[in-house]
């Protein structure tokens, strides 16, 4: 018998049935491009604001804060120096927001159209409008998140959230009280916490945990790349893997030392050939929401003494830019390996300053026990070392960034 062509409708039916019987290996990646912005500190200095007072207030806040209240954790980041943000969508149809992807916290929040008239910082940001979303679900629970620069307050709501092309139903914060500093001048609207559930305020399940529960990712990891070149792509967050275009060699992993936090043990800090600190071990948090590297004030003083740096401006150590080429390397010992920053890695020039001073991206930060003392490895470190956060194996991987 001669072969008969199968009708188009039958082909479509066969294709549909086959497509639904494929193996469940449909895991993928989510990719969020990041933009680099001037920090709030840079903008304030450009406008002639005295940063000494603001930095002093931040220091007093840390001294007075209680770090033992697990139901309302204090986030160490103050966002004065944060420079990288990416876009997400909330609602149906999607409302777009610029957010910081912050491993130091675990909640998602954005400003609300219900923000009070006294909080003028809300006026310059994209505001979430629940009345414009057909997928909005009321919650109403009040929440407060304490940051280094103050606190944000509001209430919880539920809606669909789109991150890197992945859609989840998410409880998030609608902020109705937003501090003037830093948010009045911030280029970002809100914060998407990439921390653990234990870090979340009010027991809210974090966005990344909801994504993990859908089993759509190739691996239970996310990775962060921060560009060193301001005129290029600001950076990238990859959900479910890493991007070999932005790193070279292999990852080397360090196990998390504290459950429920992106905290690891650091076994030494060196200036040039001399190991000065942490030989017996120090706690260090890898924080994508922080710009600088920070550590106990006494430790930073030792480092600056070894560098020959004495001058401070508004809690920042500064040197004449002509001295930068003479500054030695600073190395951090993590997981049996040495991670070295050259002077070009840890010194930066504020484009808005008209003097010859360069800023060292190293700050003193005294966190009282039991949370501290702790070091914070922020964007200054991540720019040099592409970083992968592995939830499945509770570890952090570092590779040399391209």
From Swiss-Prot:
Catalytic activity, as annotated: Cleavage of Leu-|-Xaa bond in angiotensinogen to generate angiotensin I
Keywords: Aspartyl protease, Cleavage on pair of basic residues, Disulfide bond, Glycoprotein, Hydrolase, Membrane, Protease, Secreted, Signal, Zymogen
Protein name: Renin
Prosegment residue ranges: 27-64
Protein family per UniProt: Belongs to the peptidase A1 family.
Active site per database record: 102, 287
Disulfide bridge positions per record: 115-122, 278-282, 321-358
Gene3D superfamilies, sorted: Acid Proteases
Regulation: Interaction with ATP6AP2 results in a 5-fold increased efficiency in angiotensinogen processing.
Superkingdom of source: Eukaryota
UniProt organism field: Rattus norvegicus
């Amino acid at each position: 018998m001669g072969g008969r062509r199968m009708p188009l409708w039958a082909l479509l039916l066969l294709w549909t049935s086959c497509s639904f019987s494929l193996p469940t290996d449909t895991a993928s990646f989510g990719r969020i491009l990041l933009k680099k912005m001037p920090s709030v500190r840079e903008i304030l200095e450009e406008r002639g604001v005295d940063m000494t007072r603001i930095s002093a207030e931040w220091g007093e806040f840390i001294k007075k804060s209680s770090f033992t209240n697990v139901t309302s954790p204090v986030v160490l980041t103050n966002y004065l120096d944060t420079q990288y943000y990416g876009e997400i969508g909330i609602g149906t149809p999607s409302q777009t927001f610029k957010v910081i992807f912050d491993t130091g916290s675990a909640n998602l929040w954005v400003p609300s159209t219900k923000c009070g008239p006294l909080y003028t910082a809300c006026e310059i940001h994209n505001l979430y409008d629940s009345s414009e979303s057909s997928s909005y679900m009321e919650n109403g629970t009040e929440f407060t998140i304490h940051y280094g620069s103050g606190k944000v307050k509001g209430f919880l709501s539920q809606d669909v959230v789109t991150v890197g092309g992945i859609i989840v139903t998410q409880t998030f914060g609608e902020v109705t009280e937003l501090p003037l500093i830093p948010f009045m001048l911030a280029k970002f609207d809100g914060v998407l916490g990439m921390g653990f559930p234990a870090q979340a305020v009010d027991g809210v399940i974090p966005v990344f945990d909801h994504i993990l529960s859908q089993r759509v990712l190739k691996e239970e990891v996310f990775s962060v790349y921060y560009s060193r070149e301001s005129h290029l792509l600001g950076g990238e967050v990859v959900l479910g893997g890493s991007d070999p275009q932005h790193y070279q060699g292999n990852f080397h992993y360090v196990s998390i030392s504290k459950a429920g936090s992106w905290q690891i043990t650091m076994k030494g800090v060196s200036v040039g050939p001399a190991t000065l600190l942490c030989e017996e071990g120090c706690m260090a948090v890898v924080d994508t929401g922080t710009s600088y590297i920070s550590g106990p004030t006494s430790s930073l003083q030792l480092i600056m003494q070894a560098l020959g740096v004495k001058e401070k401006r508004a809690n920042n150590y500064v040197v004449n830019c002509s001295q930068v080429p003479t500054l030695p390397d600073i190395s951090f010992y993590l997981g049996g390996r040495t991670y070295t920053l050259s002077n070009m890695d840890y010194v930066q020039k504020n484009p808005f300053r008209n003097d010859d001073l360069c800023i060292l991206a190293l700050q003193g930060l005294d966190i009282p026990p039991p949370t501290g003392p702790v070091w914070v490895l922020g964007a200054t470190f991540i720019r040099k070392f592409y970083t992968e956060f592995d939830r499945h194996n509770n570890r952090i991987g570092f590779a040399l960034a391209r």
